[in-house]
């Protein structure tokens, strides 16, 4: 099975270390353009753009990067409850047309009640999923060309329609992640690709089986994806050293403050991430080559695959064997790590999209002694 592998645009900041200004990267439009173009050149099929108050707006960033990329797809957030489904569908169709079919959409219900309240949304966890289901029902139908009348518990629209359709037919794909039963029910009923964060394979297997069964009960099939960080180096020893360096500036107070902030979330997925490390820096390898150190201070995806290229590829294949065909990866800093993943990991994967063909002056490395083209090294 060929794999769809995406990268990540760090619109909420970037750097060489977590939880410290040491090695912090100035993230501006020029830097995001560099990361997007590096991802495209290395053969990533698309990029995920995060959402939330700590991030630049994902739609505006994606739109700004369309003209400076050619094949790269942009996975941007849909936020039910804070925008009308009709307006969101219109924006989605426009982004898909502007990008000539390179727009993908990620349904994000939100997991931080404090942040949601600041955005004007005062629904409980269960109510948010009710509203998300209504939103998605309307959004999908509009993009598929229907005229929609809908009167739900949370959303009502009358004679809603789009005048300009998307490029992708019947509509752009819809991604979604969530670990609660309400989230899984929504995925089974309406989404195209269900995402999970990088839990150990046995936990992921159980979760995917639940969603697969729920979808089958609806007469549907759902694709699967996973969100992971990656720390890949020429040797596994070097990769683990890089993992240790990434959190080398974290002190106990920084970790405790981060975990206290994340504990207020009502996201089941966030609770599952926190349980993997327990807020402690010891015993962070929770499964072979799966490291939970990033989740000590980062919300959302908090685990990384660590190792040399062949080892990380083996771990990715273990997830692929569970039925996962889409891998959304990232690494710190995101510019350099995009190249490392492309150079050290991709030769060991069966990719759905290959690196962008380049007409370079010299693509074989620096000439040796002004005379010899460097010899080709076989991958092992």
From Swiss-Prot:
InterPro entries: Alkanesulphonate_mOase_FMN-dep (IPR019911), Luciferase-like_dom (IPR011251), Luciferase-like_sf (IPR036661), SsuD_RutA_monooxygenase (IPR050172). GO terms for molecular function: alkanesulfonate monooxygenase activity. The keyword Flavoprotein applies. Keywords: Flavoprotein, FMN, Monooxygenase, Oxidoreductase. The keyword Membrane does not apply. It is an enzyme of class 1 (oxidoreductase). It catalyses: an alkanesulfonate + FMNH2 + O2 = an aldehyde + FMN + sulfite + H2O + 2 H(+). Its EC number is 1.14.14.5. Gene3D superfamilies: Luciferase-like domain (3.20.20.30). Catalyzes the desulfonation of aliphatic sulfonates. This is Alkanesulfonate monooxygenase. It comes from Pectobacterium carotovorum subsp. carotovorum (strain PC1).
């Amino acid at each position: 099975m060929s794999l769809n592998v995406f990268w990540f645009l760090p619109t909420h900041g970037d750097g060489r270390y977590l939880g410290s200004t040491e090695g912090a990267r100035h993230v501006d439009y020029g830097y995001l353009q560099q990361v997007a173009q590096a991802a495209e050149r290395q053969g990533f099929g698309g990029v995920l753009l995060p959402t939330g108050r700590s991030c630049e707006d994902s739609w505006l960033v994606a739109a700004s990067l369309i003209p400076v990329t050619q094949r790269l797809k942009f996975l941007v957030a849909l936020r039910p409850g804070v925008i009308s489904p009709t307006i969101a569908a219109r924006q989605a169709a426009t982004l898909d047309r502007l990008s000539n079919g390179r727009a993908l959409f990620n349904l994000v219900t939100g997991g931080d009640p404090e942040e949601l309240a600041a955005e004007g949304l005062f629904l409980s966890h269960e109510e948010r999923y009710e509203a998300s289901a209504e939103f998605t029902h309307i959004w999908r139908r509009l993009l598929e060309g229907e005229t929609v009348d809908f009167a739900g518990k949370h959303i009502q629209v009358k004679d809603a329609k789009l005048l300009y359709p998307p490029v992708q037919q019947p509509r752009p794909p819809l991604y979604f992640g969530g670990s609660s039963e309400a989230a899984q029910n929504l995925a089974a009923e309406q989404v195209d690709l269900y995402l999970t964060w990088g839990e150990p394979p046995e936990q992921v297997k159980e979760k995917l089986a639940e969603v697969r069964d729920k979808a089958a009960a609806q007469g549907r099939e759902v694709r699967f994806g996973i969100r992971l960080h990656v720390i890949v180096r020429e040797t596994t020893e070097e990769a683990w050293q890089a993992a240790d360096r990434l959190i080398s500036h974290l002190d106990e107070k920084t970790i405790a403050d981060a975990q206290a902030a994340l504990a207020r979330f009502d996201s089941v997925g966030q609770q599952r991430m926190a349980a993997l490390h327990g807020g402690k820096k010891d015993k962070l390898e929770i499964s072979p080559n799966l490291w939970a150190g990033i989740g000590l201070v980062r919300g959302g995806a908090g685990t990384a695959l660590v190792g040399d290229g062949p080892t990380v590829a083996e771990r990715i294949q273990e997830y692929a064997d569970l039925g996962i065909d889409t891998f959304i990866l990232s690494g710190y800093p995101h510019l350099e790590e995009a190249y490392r993943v492309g150079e050290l990991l991709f030769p060991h994967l069966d990719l759905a999209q290959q690196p962008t063909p380049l007409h370079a002056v010299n693509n074989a490395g620096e000439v040796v002694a002004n005379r010899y083209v460097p010899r080709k090294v076989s991958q092992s």
